[in-house]
């Protein structure tokens, strides 16, 4: 029987978690207040920038900038994903294209197709993953 344990604690004043399987560390995560690529926010359009075609958004962690903001009006709500690290004093760069990445698959909501990792060479395993997704 596989023994799985999740440990929650603080590391250097930040929340941390670890996944241990059969006494071996499998995953380690430190939560910080800096928005990192991959985080998903429900944002509200703050003000469109007409000349650039983008817009500034309000998120729980501050201001964000969306490059492809055409057709959005002030007050509109949308889901966005952080696409890069924000420079000091600048807005968080975000995208409307949501990607949920894992070790085996990439899920692209609202887009057709299945994306299975190329590292999985075993055809049976690939078919199992496809069956789980559908």
Identify the role of each PLM range.
Residues 1-134:
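Single-stranded RNA-binding surfaces
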């Amino acid at each position: 029987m596989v023994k799985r344990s999740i440990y929650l604690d603080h590391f250097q004043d930040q929340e941390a978690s670890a996944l241990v399987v059969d006494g071996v560390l499998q995953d380690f995560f430190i939560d910080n207040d800096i928005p990192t690529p991959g985080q998903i926010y429900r944002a509200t359009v703050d003000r469109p920038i007409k000349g650039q075609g983008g817009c500034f958004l309000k998120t729980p962690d501050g201001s964000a900038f969306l490059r492809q903001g055409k057709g959005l009006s002030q007050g509109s709500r949308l889901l966005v994903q952080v696409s890069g690290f924000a420079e000091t004093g600048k807005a968080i760069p975000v995208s409307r294209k949501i990607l949920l990445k894992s070790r085996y698959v990439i899920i692209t909501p609202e887009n057709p197709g299945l994306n299975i990792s190329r590292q999985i060479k075993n055809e049976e395993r690939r078919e199992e993953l496809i069956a789980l997704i559908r």
